[in-house]
């Protein structure tokens, strides 16, 4: 019965997202909340300048409302769901402020790095101290085994790293039409299956609400995109997926299921280190999706390829997390 409820959860979030988007997009246009495109980005992206951004609010509202209602309906509104809603709200708020400054104050970089980091730290610290001992414990497990390692206070550092790093990694992936929407749906779908296997149904409900919300948004975000989610959506999704992995004790498995996000982040790190130490670039442009664009791939080809890689990694993650 609950499995059907999870499908209903995804369906409700999808319908809310699809219903809200056509209403919200004209509103964003009216407010002139258009995306500004950086000059150093691919030249083909300049035509996207002015496309409404901050569409992540639709994802945000759809998944928050649906997960809250369905968790209450199925009596699974526990500490886990509350923590997930807290992280989603907090990181979504940071993203909203970042987007607002970009489009209203006309400051292309939004919040400063320090401002953003402080906000991310505060939410991560709150998550740890509220959830420690109640929703999660301070050990990690080796995926596919019963082996666990108690980290004590080192786990605090891991939580900070995962939430801050996860939110920024997912944010880096949001550079092509539909890329993040699709990869996020795949990753959260994989974690929902693992959550069901662990009988953590509150987490599963939340994950399926995210799946439905981002797929509904994808209808309007696929190439050519009518709207971008902005940092409002990407930071919220990044913080949420890291929190899900922590609550399911699948911290290490996140590297596999979120492999696309990891590859995007590593490409940026490698590019920066290489350029600063040798003066040469490893990639034509980073993050990685831009490299393939400059290699002559169409935007749609890059997106579908990354979706496919994300799907294969998700299947591998499910196999390790559920059946090994």
Swiss-Prot record:
Its EC number is 2.7.8.13. It is an enzyme of class 2 (transferase). The chain crosses the membrane at residues 5-25, 52-72, 77-97, 122-142, 149-169, 176-196, 201-221, 227-247, 253-273, 302-322. GO terms for molecular function: metal ion binding; phospho-N-acetylmuramoyl-pentapeptide-transferase activity; UDP-N-acetylmuramoyl-L-alanyl-D-glutamyl-meso-2,6-diaminopimelyl-D-alanyl-D-alanine:undecaprenyl-phosphate transferase activity. One of its GO terms (biological process) is cell division. Belongs to the glycosyltransferase 4 family. MraY subfamily. NCBIfam families: mraY. This is Phospho-N-acetylmuramoyl-pentapeptide-transferase. The gene is mraY.
